[in-house]
Amino acid sequence: MAFARRLLRGPLSGPLLGRRGVCAGAMAPPRRFVLELPDCTLAHFALGADAPGDADAPDPRLAALLGPPERSYSLCVPVTPDAGCGARVRAARLHQRLLHQLRRGPFQRCQLLRLLCYCPGGQAGGAQQGFLLRDPLDDPDTRQALLELLGACQEAPRPHLGEFEADPRGQLWQRLWEVQDGRRLQVGCAQVVPVPEPPLHPVVPDLPSSVVFPDREAARAVLEECTSFIPEARAVLDLVDQCPKQIQKGKFQVVAIEGLDATGKTTVTQSVADSLKAVLLKSPPSCIGQWRKIFDDEPTIIRRAFYSLGNYIVASEIAKESAKSPVIVDRYWHSTATYAIATEVSGGLQHLPPAHHPVYQWPEDLLKPDLILLLTVSPEERLQRLQGRGMEKTREEAELEANSVFRQKVEMSYQRMENPGCHVVDASPSREKVLQTVLSLIQNSFSEP
């Protein structure tokens, strides 16, 4: 233990280093990292001698965040590229537990940033979620608390703890720590090398397996892994399994109405349903709405599986009701997908998947509406309406209110949805005017040959 403490306190010095960019004995394949900075820009770097970067051309943003006089640490939850659904669920739950712990105790004085570890080349399944913790005081208590946190994680997956510091030449390095048999040991050290930003955000290849599920079975597999610790997951699965997989829309029109919170969506959907003598359905449906708060408190992969399966339950209801009358749906698949994309893709608008990317395509096994309307209002109008509602906010409602970049990513994702796309409706005018506009769009859509 004394040896571990000496390593923990000791400076990074010459004898510790091997060939360029890596400590002796630590020749792991280079991985890349993307760090979301406070201004929503992204900084990419790699570790190791063979990393395809340029150590002689440092990124000043990395030097400011990882170098002295403050102290920075990385904490990543490992997931192998070939990991199954159960492993991804366990990793997501550990990531969320770590997030809660990093907001308490000695960590409260630290700056917490979003960090993603990934394999180069756009390989699906290789993204690892994590954090960068920036201690402004370089307090040994922070390091000790992190090592204790690492030691408390006895079950797989165990997080990887890295510590950043600069050598006498000003080059950045990362030490990697593990806790083995109660001993805290340094197990690796590699140079931090800036690398170019890849053409596609590295989390995008993982979206279909983690949050934007391409079909019913993919979402179902996630909740199946949750039944041992979320009893309500079994109830949701039982309801989904009662819904036929092969369904068809009836002869009457089906219109889905989408929009951010406080765009007047609830009022418009009810008014349109009354005007058309239509059945009004909501996603998630009432049969699982009682469990919404439970799943909203879970990691994104579980939360999105819940909402995705809710869409399939709604689809079954649509098929039944559209045989008898028109159907208006308050939110549907587009809502589930857009919030997931905006949440998972770090950075700004420019980092979203490009237009026409497959992630924006409607699932082939989910019943499609005839028309999708997207209600929009100005940010100022939406904020004013939110403040007047006085209702408890979901995590995403609070994020929309506090984070303009997140709101813009949600709106852009809505606009990039295809097959079917969204018809944008300005919901800023009076309720009567908005209702008239919506009814006119519906009438024109169904009167076209």
Curated annotation (Swiss-Prot):
EC number: 2.7.4.14, 2.7.4.6
Positions with a binding annotation for ATP: G259, L260, D261, A262, T263, G264, K265, T266
Gene3D superfamilies: P-loop containing nucleotide triphosphate hydrolases
Entries under InterPro entries matching the protein: P-loop_NTPase, Thymidylate_kin-like_dom, UMP-CMP_kinase_2
Induction: By interferon-alpha. IRF1 is crucial for the transcriptional activation of CMPK2.
Location(s), subcellular: Mitochondrion
Transit peptide: 1-98
Coiled-coil zones: 380-412
Disease entry from the Swiss-Prot or TrEMBL record: Basal ganglia calcification, idiopathic, 10, autosomal recessive: A form of basal ganglia calcification, a genetically heterogeneous condition characterized by symmetric calcification in the basal ganglia and other brain regions. Affected individuals can either be asymptomatic or show a wide spectrum of neuropsychiatric symptoms, including parkinsonism, dystonia, tremor, ataxia, dementia, psychosis, seizures, and chronic headache. Serum levels of calcium, phosphate, alkaline phosphatase and parathyroid hormone are normal.
Name of the molecule in the record: UMP-CMP kinase 2, mitochondrial
Organism: Homo sapiens (Human)
Source organism phylogeny: Eukaryota, Metazoa, Chordata, Craniata, Vertebrata
